[in-house]
Every structure is written in C-alpha cells, then in structure tokens.
C-alpha cells in the first residue's frame, strides 16, 4: 500500500500518514563541524523534516520536478515487498508504490521522452544473480511498464544514453552470477539489439561517458581506460592507464563541463575509491594524442562510496564516503568543491550524517543539491535528507542573493544547432547560459551527468540562445537550463528537451566510369570517375584504391586515367566519407589486364603441295 509523508514546508513539521511498513532508520549521530559554516564562502547545509520511507538506492530527476526513487528489496534478502517512491522536493511529500520485481541494484537513466528506464536488478541474493527484465516509468501516470527483456541478466549494470537517443547497457552479473561482458543497446519503441561481445571483462558498474565524437569512454574502476564505438560495436585496446596503482572501487567519475570556447574538449575526472580509500583524483584530456591520466588535487578526505555532483557553475561537489568501506567510524563529512578553472578544491562545509554505501546526491532545479541515503548495514538505512545550498545563492554577509529570473523559454523539443529564446527581465546582466542533464545517480556514479555551455546573444528582454550542435555533445532528453548573472548567481532552472535525432546514416559511393567490369591490355589505361551521396548530410571525402594501377590511389571524385602495366585481375574501389565521419561500403569494379602481344592463327581451307596461300588481317589498336 502507499505511504505518504506530508510536510507544511521544506523545513516545517511533518504530519505522518503511513499505511506501509517503513524501513528501519540508521541510528547515526549527527556530525557537528568544528568551524561554523560561512554561507557566502562555503554554502550552507540543512536537514529536512521529510524522510525517505524506503531505502533510496536509485534516484532520477524527472522533467516534472519530481524524483523517482527505486529501492526494490532495499538490500534486505528476505524482503519481497519490492518498492519505489516519488519524492516531491517542493511539496515535501514522498509517495511509495510497489513494483512487480526486484529492481535492487539496477542501472537507471531517463529516456529522451522523459521516462526513466530501469535496467536489470536482483534475481537472487548471496551470491547475487542478475535480472533480465527492464521497465520504464511514466511520470504522468506514475506507473511502471515492463519492456523487452535483455538476452542475459544484469545486476550492477551501467546504462548510458548515446548521442542518437539509444541507451547502452554494459556489465553486471548475469542470471547465473557470471559477469556480463556484452554490450546491448536499447532503441526506444523498438527493443534491444543483439549482444556485442566486449572481449574483456569489465568491473561492475563501470564508469562510462559519451564523448563529443560519439564514442563511449570507460574511465574505471579498473586502471586501463578504453573507448567503445557504437557504430562498429567494438572496444578499443587500452588507450591510457591511471597513475593510481589500485582499482578505484566505488570512486566516482565526472565528465567536466563541455564549452564551445574550447571546442567541447572532453576532460574526465575520477575521484577517490579503493579500500582503504584514496583522497586522490586524476584527470584525462581526451583531445590529446595519446591521452594520459594526470593527478589532480587531492580531496580533503579519503572516500569510498562517495558522491560527485556537477553544479551549474561547472564546479563539482564531492560528498560522503569513508576511509574504510561501509564504516561509519571513518565517514567523510567534509564536502569538497572542485573548480576546473583553477584545478583546486575548496571547502563546501560539512554535512551532518554519514553517507556511505547506497547514498546519493542529486542537483535540483533550484540549484541546490539533495544528499540522501546510506546503507552500510543490511536492515538499516539513513532516512534523513540533507540539502546543500551552494555559496552562489548567498551574498558575502550570508543573506540570500537576488537571482535572475526566467519567465519563458521557446517551446521544445529543441533541435540541435537551432536558435531559441529565453525570456528574462535580467537579460542585460546575464553572463552565462548552461544546460545540466537531469541526474540519475546510484552507487557513487551519476550515469548521464554532464554540463554543456551554450552560445547566446543579448536582446531586449531576451537571450537568443543556440542549442548544442549535436547529440554527442548533449544526448537527447531533458536538461535543466540555468542562466547566470555577472555576480555569479544562477536562476531557478526550467526543463528543456533536446530532440532525439535519427542515427547518422552512412553515405553511398558509386563508380560511374567504368560502369561495368573491363578487360584491357597491359600498358593500357582505364578512365575512372565516381560520385557519392549522403541521405542526411554531405560527402566530405573520396578515397580510391587502384591495386596494380598507376597511380594506386586518389582522393578526388574523378581521378581520370589509371595505367595498368602488369597482367592480372584487379579490384578498384571507391569509398566516401560524410560530415558525420561515417564511411560508405566500397563500390568496386574488376579490371582484367591481359598480355599485350597479338597472336594470329591461320587455317586455310585449301592447300596444295608446293603452293602459296595469301592471307590478310586487320588489327585495330585502341588507346584510351
């Protein structure tokens, strides 16, 4: 049955109306920081009266401003009352509902249409076996619907939205308890692809990020980094190794802000992890050739089972975790704020309660961050919710800063590269416009997290903004749109939707001359000409190959005459490449080169002894 928690305000008293069993609350003692927080410098922390009635293991921010919480069995093996909930941060309510199977330890992202996708879960405990099932949640009707099952189960999978709106899933334990080493790709409305074997064994919940070139980058928790090509369905060899010698188990990974001013250079940062944990961080610039990991600044505390949340100003908030796994005695209460511009950490104050295994942090539309959960021991969890209000919401004296206001946004979905308008009376003061992907964190990782800065110009009471150029920069779906004023204060963010785009279609090559296979004599030449076409773009490159010919290659559409000197059979080919980087299948023609000598056989019909017979032959030599 449903359980509803009612509050008068965000920090007001709670009136309980509970008809379902509530999980036990962990008896954690509140941490009291030694130094009083300074809101204008560090931000501030508060604990809500609202509490989580189920173990909040998985969370997803939906485009109606509500947060889907998924618990399943809640890390209690004997619990068959599988649960989910919807939290309304503004109203202060949490409404629970049953789910049809155990979604504990799934992978979850929000589809481009706004529906959360739950992928896999728990088939059996100790040892764990993975579910083959997946489901989508409708934010309007608040119902789950099962979709096509995967080929094999996944417990602890990672799911990632690709640049065309499809969803990739990788790793997890199968229905037999083995590591699932295959990639599957889900197309909304169609179903799952065949399995694509990886050829290597990933960790559980691998850290994956979609890059601006469309490939998927694996950053850990293992030491060797790789990329996956969604077009060829293949993994690269290891392209870089981390400096930290151990695995960063339950550390976090963040794709740092993508900005047009830097050509959307992709940089990934990994935080903490390991047991005992490390405080170290590392950063890789994937525009370098070859890319390599470099140590970043250390956090103030070592963290395993931590959280890392990107804020709308591009800084990254690191919270929770502990030195030793699932150990409240070594919990990390300090909150650290990483600034990519200065490559340094500063203090974001301290939260009050240990946030360990199964804790989560989530950016909300008002620019605050919710910190909740923690489940170091089965049968108990931390039910209290904390809210971090960053320093950008305060003046230097600690009073509330005046925020810019967005009154309207062009109705979506927005097309890539298209212009749209943001109406604001504060247009003349705006210094930055950014999109932040609606979050979906679990197990120390937000699977689709990213921030993309937008180009814009200022008009009379409006901002003329340009959407990201393509889905690899910002995959289709819902984003929080923040505007920032010159004082560094953000607006409250409305949701905007980037339209799903069809997958890039490959171009087609055609050899027009010769139009059929040809036979020539050694020393002759053949005239070549070709064309290329692309159904959703333009052809940008031609590549000819002429085995046995001179020249043996060309990069123009019509290379002209190619000389063949050696007898044999050769296959000439043309391949074209489009503006999306996709190449066509080759167009081919066979060239048969014969010996150039002429042989005549004379067979007269009448011959007399001692007589002479005269014959004549006409030989025509055609030189092309």
Annotate each PLM feature.
Residues 486-488, 577-582:
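Short, solvent-exposed loop/turn segments at the edges of extracellular beta-sandwich modules
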Residues 404, 503-508, 598:
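Proline-centered linker/hinge motifs at extracellular inter-domain junctions
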Residues 35-502:
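Kelch-like beta-propeller repeat domains
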Residues 543-561:
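Surface-exposed, flexible coil segments in extracellular/virion-facing regions
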Residues 412-416, 517-524, 606-617:
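Short, solvent-exposed loop/linker segments at the N-terminal edge
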Residues 511-514, 528-533, 543-544, 559, ...:
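Residue-level signature of extracellular beta-strand-rich folds
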Residues 419-421, 522-533, 616-622:
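A short beta-strand segment in extracellular, disulfide-stabilized domains
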Residues 424-429, 532-536, 578, 621-624:
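Extracellular acidic, Ser/Thr/Pro-rich low-complexity tracts
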